[in-house]
Amino acid sequence: RDAVFAEEDTKGRSRTDVILNFMEYEYKKLRAAGLFVSADVFGAIINSDVNADSVGQIYGEMAKHLDYISPMIYPSHYSDGNYGIDHPDTRPYDTICAALTESRKELYFAGLDGGHVAAVRPWLQDFTASWLKNHIPYGGEQVRDQIRAVYDCGYDEWLLWDAACTYDWDGLLTPEAADAETEEIAASRAMLPETTYAPEEAGHDALTVTEGAQNGDSAAVSGRAGTGLTVGDFPAGQALSEALETAEEPGTPPETGTTLPPTA
């Protein structure tokens, strides 16, 4: 039903206060019922106080009241110059890596008190942003580049979005290729120093469509690697490819759930 929220209804609370109060309430209720809780958030709030304040979404604080947080880090949604990238839409791999590096920093600080923080399952772009002056066509190659960036940044899960629901399946893997990639990722991460693993039941690269295609709604594609690496288990701010270049011998892993301080 229609509702009007007037200034007097806020009782002095900010947008952030209202959002976090609600999230804390619903997280306790839903978890008590044995349910997992997730939320989609704007990607721009991760490293921008201006964007965070304007919509009331504070990334690290919201992550304390969720099991999964899904930042919408579509390269097309970043303005020219973001993360030092002239035209983010034209460099999907670099843009996703930059956004997830900032995500890791924010969640590192959010978890310094030893409390819970959500696992990260980012939204990736599977559409062409033709409204941008500086854009490129998105197809299987660009989808794969973004997925590779997720894995290289130490995360395992992702979602694809296309409002037209015309997904580029050639950017995804067959079960056989996904198994091979999972083994490669696990072997590569095992070479990294100070990395902790939380083994889970192996999963596959995405070949499934989530519910939500009813009544004209668009469906979303989701997937994850099968290594079970969790938030806080990868050297912060360090892409897999970069870490492999400097890694010599595996060091002593920290306790599960800990992480290194973020790099500059």
Describe every region a protein language model picked out:
Residues 26-28, 197, 224, 238:
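Surface-exposed charge patches in extracellular/virion surface proteins
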Residues 66-77, 97, 102, 106-193:
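Substrate-binding cleft of secreted/luminal carbohydrate-active enzymes
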Residues 32, 171, 180-190, 212, ...:
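Polar/charged alpha-helical tracts
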Residues 1-4:
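Active-site groove signature of glycoside hydrolases
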Residues 6-41, 46-49, 53-130:
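Glycoside hydrolase catalytic-domain groove-lining segments
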Residues 207, 211-264:
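Long, low-complexity, intrinsically disordered segments
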